[in-house]
Amino acid sequence: MMLSVFGLSVPISATELLLASFVFCLVFWVVRAWQPRVPKGLKSPPGPWGWPLLGHVLTLGKNPHLVLARLSQHYGDVLQIRIGSTPVLVLSGLDTIRQALVRQGDDFKGRPNLYSFTLISEGQSMSFSPDSGPVWAARRRLAQNALKSFSIASDPASSSSCYLEDHVSKEAEYLIGKFQELMAKVGHFDPYRYVVVSVANVICAMCFGRRYDHDDQELLSIVNLSNEFGDGTASGNPVDFFPILRYLPNPALDFFKDVNEKFSIFIHKMVKEHYKTFEKGHIRDITDSLIEHCQDKRLDENANIQLSDEKIVNVVSDLFGAGFDTVTTAISWCLMYLVTSPNVQEKIQKELDTVIGRERQPRLSDRLQLPYMEAFILEMFRHTSFVPFTIPHSTTKDTSLSGFYIPKERCVFVNQWQINHDQKLWGDPSEFRPERFLTPDGTINKALSEKVILFGLGKRKCIGETIARLEVFLFLAILLQQVEFSVPQGTKVDMTPIYGLTMKHARCEHFQVRMRT
C-alpha cells in the first residue's frame, strides 16, 4: 500500500496503518476522557493550543501576568490554559472577577492543593491551605479580630489614637534619624534595607509585643528572606505542575524549603516564649490573645470548634506575613516614584504643610484631609500592580461563569494586573497620574478608587488590607513632612518590576534625603 503525504508516496503496510489508526483513536479517547462533560447550554472556556506534556509553561515566560493579559484580549475574560497537564482557569476583567469572587464567592473560595503550599506553615497556612470550611472560616474571623484589637483599637498606655499609630510613629522617626546618619557618613543609601526592618518591627510589636534593633541578626535573617518566599509562591511555579521537579536536583526548591523552615522555627520560638510568660487577664499582643482563645477551648460562639496550640503558630505566621511583605513593598515603590516624579513629591508636601503644618506629627485621622497623598498611594497600587495575581483560587463545586462550565477543583488564576491596566477602565493605564483619582472639587473619586484591585476580593480577600493601607499612609506622611527624597541628577532608577508573589524593583543605593526647612 502507498500513502501520499505532502505529494510524496510513502510505502505503508496494512498492519502499520491499522496500528496508527488504533494509536490515534486511543489518544483521542484519552483526551476526551480527561475533558469534563459540559452540561447542555454551557461551553468550555476557550484558550490557545499548548505543547504536549508542557502545556503553556513556555508561553507564560518570566512575566505571566503580561502574557495572560494579552491572551485575554483575544480569548476574553474567561480563558483556560494548561501548565503541564493541569488545566488552569484564568480570570480577567473587573466585572468577571467580581462576579466570581464576590457574587459567587462560595464557588471560588477554595485553594488548589499545590505542592509549594504544603511547605508553608507545615501545610496548615490559613492563606495557602486548601481548607475553606467552617474551621477555616472561624480561624479567619479570630485572626481578623486579633489583628484589629492590636492595630486600630485604642492604646490606653499611649497618647496615639491606636496601637498602629504608636508603632508606626516610632519607626518612622527612627528611619528619619537613620537616613540623616547615613547621609552624614556616606552621602547616599538604599532605603529598602531599613524600611523592611521598620515594617517588620511594627508587625512584631503587634504580634509579639517587642521591637528589635535594626542590626538584630535574628530578625534580619527572617526579613531578608521575603524575596525568596515570593519567588516560591508566585502563580505558575513549575514545581506545582511538574511533580518530577520535586525529585530532581532543584536548588530553588531547596532554598524555598529552607526559607519556610527558618520562618517556622522563628514563629515557634516566639509563641513558646509567650506560653511561658502568659498571664490570663493581662493580654499583651496578638499571640497572647490567641493563647487566651485556645485556653477557652472555643473558636466560634455558635460552633464547637477548637483552636489547637499548633494552629496558633499557623495563625501568627499568616498574620506576620500578611502585615509585612505587602507593606514593605508598597512603601519601597512609593519612594521610587517620589524620586522619579519630584513634582508629585512637591505636591504631597505642599498638601501636608497646608493641612498639618510642622508643629505636630501626622496622624491616621488626617488621612481624609490629604486626598492628593491618598491619590498618590492609589496610583502606586494601580500602576505597579505589585501583587499581579491573587494567591491561586480553586472551585469548591461544579459551577458556571459567563456561560462557561467550570468543574470542581479547577485551579484559578485571578489577574489583578490586567484589571489595573485595562484601557477600558483607565484610558491611559501606562501613565503614572495620581490626579486621575481626584474629583473636580479635589476629593477622592470613591467609585474609581474601588476599581483598583491589589488585595483580592471576596471571601479570600487579604485580612490585612485595612491595616496595610493605614500603615503605608502614616509612614509616608511622617517621612514626607520632615524630609525630601532624591537621587543625584542623571542617576538611572530602574522601575522594572521583578515577577513574584509581590513584584519588587531593583534595589537603588543612590537615595539621598535632606531635612525640610
Curated annotation (Swiss-Prot):
Residues 34-45 are annotated as: Mitochondrial targeting signal. It catalyses: an organic molecule + reduced [NADPH--hemoprotein reductase] + O2 = an alcohol + oxidized [NADPH--hemoprotein reductase] + H2O + H(+); estrone + reduced [NADPH--hemoprotein reductase] + O2 = 2-hydroxyestrone + oxidized [NADPH--hemoprotein reductase] + H2O + H(+); estrone + reduced [NADPH--hemoprotein reductase] + O2 = 4-hydroxyestrone + oxidized [NADPH--hemoprotein reductase] + H2O + H(+); estrone + reduced [NADPH--hemoprotein reductase] + O2 = 6alpha-hydroxyestrone + oxidized [NADPH--hemoprotein reductase] + H2O + H(+). It is a peripheral membrane protein. Its EC number is 1.14.14.1, 4.2.1.152. Pathway: Steroid hormone biosynthesis; Lipid metabolism; fatty acid metabolism; Cofactor metabolism; retinol metabolism. Heme binds at C462. Its main location: endoplasmic reticulum. Its cofactor is heme. GO terms for molecular function: arachidonate monooxygenase activity; estrogen 16-alpha-hydroxylase activity; estrogen 2-hydroxylase activity; heme binding; Hsp70 protein binding; Hsp90 protein binding; hydroperoxy icosatetraenoate dehydratase activity; iron ion binding. Keywords: Cytoplasm, Endoplasmic reticulum, Glycoprotein, Heme, Iron, Lipid biosynthesis, Lipid metabolism, Lyase, Membrane, Metal-binding, Microsome, Mitochondrion, Mitochondrion inner membrane, Monooxygenase, Oxidoreductase, Steroid biosynthesis. Substrate binds at F229. Glycans are attached at S72. Transmembrane segments: none annotated. PROSITE patterns: CYTOCHROME_P450 (PS00086). One of its GO terms (cellular component) is mitochondrial inner membrane. GO terms for biological process: amine metabolic process; estrogen metabolic process; hydrogen peroxide biosynthetic process; lipid hydroxylation; long-chain fatty acid metabolic process; phenol-containing compound metabolic process; response to toxic substance; retinol metabolic process. It is found in: Endoplasmic reticulum membrane; Mitochondrion inner membrane; Microsome membrane; Cytoplasm. It comes from the Eukaryota. PANTHER family: CYTOCHROME P450 1A, STEROID 17-ALPHA-HYDROXYLASE/17,20 LYASE. A cytochrome P450 monooxygenase involved in the metabolism of various endogenous substrates, including fatty acids, steroid hormones and vitamins. Mechanistically, uses molecular oxygen inserting one oxygen atom into a substrate, and reducing the second into a water molecule, with two electrons provided by NADPH via cytochrome P450 reductase (CPR; NADPH-ferrihemoprotein reductase). Catalyzes the hydroxylation of carbon-hydrogen bonds. Interacts with cytosolic chaperones HSP70 and HSP90; this interaction is required for initial targeting to mitochondria. Interacts (via mitochondrial targeting signal) with TOMM40 (via N-terminus); this interaction is required for translocation across the mitochondrial outer membrane. Belongs to the cytochrome P450 family. This is Cytochrome P450 1A1. It comes from Felis catus (Cat). The lineage of its organism: Eukaryota, Metazoa, Chordata, Craniata, Vertebrata. The gene is CYP1A1.
